[in-house]
C-alpha cells in the first residue's frame, strides 16, 4: 500500500475540474425501453414519429347534432331551420347512420362524424322535439369538428430525442398508442457514508454517535440530477469494511460517491484504499476552497470515485459543483432548469482569507420582491445550516468581504427554489415553534423560514424590510421596559408594531438536583462553575450583561472584569435547547435560558427574572395572509392552552395578540 499523502497539493476548483476531465469524460450510457408508467422524468433516446393519425377519424368537439352545414344557412333566432333527427352517435362507436339533406344525428363530444355530415351544431343553439330539430344558428363546414390527423399525422414527429418526459409528453405517447418508450439509461450510483460515529436513521443512538445524514442527502441529490442509487450503505472507519463497501459499489454502479474519511486525520483511510487499486488511482486530493478542502477524486477500474467531505453542507456543496454536472450529462439531461439566481447581500460578509469560499445562504425577499442572500451562521457541520440554506455564494480567495447590498450570484442547491410564505428573523423561542405547529394544522402547505439571529438582529431585519416579523425580548436598561423603547431607537415607530406575545421565565439551567448549589448570576463568578453564553445581540445575552453591570456597580468594578472571571463567557450558542443539552451531558454547570428548556430536558431551574417575548411586525405586512393567520392563531384560546401544556414557563396573558404601540 502506498504512503499516504496529506493534502500534498491543494488545487483550485478549475484545476481540479481539468484534471478530472483528463481521466473521466461523462457521456450518456446507452438506452433502454421502459413502460410509460415508469418513464416520468426520463430522457427520450430516439425521435418518436406517430404511427397513426391523431385523431384517427373526424370527431365531434362539442355535444350537439351532426349535420350538413348548408342545411343551416340562414338560420337565426327568429327564423329557425327545421331538420329531421334520424339517429344518434355515441362516443366509441362506428356510426351506422348516414346524413342526407334535411337530416341530423344527435352526437356526443368525441364521437365519430357520420357519413354525409360536415359540421356539428352545438346543442345550445337547437331545440329537439320528437323527430324534429329546430336550429337557431348557422354553422360553417368543418365547424365543431376535429379532422382526422389534425393533431398528428402518420409519420409526423411526435417527440424528439433529448426531450425530458413530463406528464404532457407521456400523454402524447399514449395518444399514438405506445406502451413503451426508449429512454437514456440512468447512471447507477453507489452512495457510501463513512465514519465510526454514524448510525443509520431509525437505529439506536448512544452518546457520541450521530445519525447518518449524508447518504440520505446525497441519494436524494443523485435522483434530482437524473441518477439512480444502486447501493446506499454506511461503512465503519476500518480498512476492511470501507474497502468492502467500495468494492461493492464499483461492482454495482457506474459512479461511486463516498462522504467522510477524506481528511488528513488519524483513522481516515479513503485515500490509501483508493490509491491501492493501482493507476491512475487518486487524481485529486484537496481543494483550495472552503468548505470542501478534503475532496478526493479517483479513477478505479475505469470508474469514477468522488470522496466528498463529511460535513453535510460541505458534501452537498462539492456535489453541486463537481458531481451533479457529471451525473446529469451521463443521464443525458440538459441543464434547462435554472440553478443560479441573482441576489444582494443582506449584510456585510467577511470571508476566509486566502481560500476561495462557498458561503451557504438563505434567500429571502425584501419589500420590493428582490432576493436577499442571508448567510447561515452555523458551520458546515450543522444540519440547520443545510436545511435552511437555499444555495451558496462563490467568494474568490482575494476577496475578504462583501458589502451590504452588494450584488452576488447564488448557486442553488436545487432547481426547486420554493419562496417562503413567512420569513421570521429574530430571537429563538420554543413558543414560536408551537405557534407555527398550530398554524400548520389548518395550513399544512405553509412555508416558513426562521433565522435565529437574536433580538437585535430581529430589529435590524425588520428595519431593513427583510422579514415579515421578528421574535424580540430586548430589555431597556433605563426604563426597565421590554421592546417598546427600541422602536424609536431603530427608527421603527411609524413602520412597525409590537404585538404582545407572552411572559417567559428566564433563569439559570442547572443539573438535576442543582449539585453545585447555584442560586443566582453571582455564582457564575465561582471558579468551579463552567458556563455557556448566548450569542451577542440575543435578549438573553443582554439580560445577563445587565445583571453583570448591576453586580459590577455593587462591587465597584467593571462588567468586563466580572465577565472575564466567568468560565465560558466567550463560548456562545444560539438556542435555549443547546444550553440545556450542554448541561444535561455535563459539558457545563449552568447557562442562562428559559424554564421551558430546563423542563424539556429534565433539569433544574433557578429563576432570575420574567421577561416579555413579543412579535415585531412591519405594518405593511399585517395584511399579508400568512401573517394574519399567525396573529389569529396567537390570539386563540386553543394556542394559549397548548402553550401552557407544552411549554411550562411560557405564560400567555389577556394582552397576548394585541398591538401595544
Name every feature range the model reports, one short phrase each.
Residues 441-523:
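N-terminal segment of the mature folded domain
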Residues 1-14, 179-308, 312-318, 434, ...:
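Helix-rich terminal scaffold detector
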Residues 471-489, 580-609:
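A ligand-binding cleft/hinge motif common to bilobed small-molecule-binding domains
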Residues 419-428, 522-547:
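Short loop->beta-strand "edge-of-pocket" segments that line small-molecule binding or catalytic clefts
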Residues 14-17, 32-37, 46, 92, ...:
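Flexible glycine/proline-rich
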Residues 1-79, 106, 121, 324, ...:
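Short, low-complexity N-terminal leaders and the immediately following helix N-cap/first helix
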Residues 2, 6-13, 66-236, 368-378, ...:
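Short, glycine/charged-enriched hinge/interface segments at domain edges or termini
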Residues 493-505, 599, 603-632, 652-657:
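Periplasmic-binding protein-like
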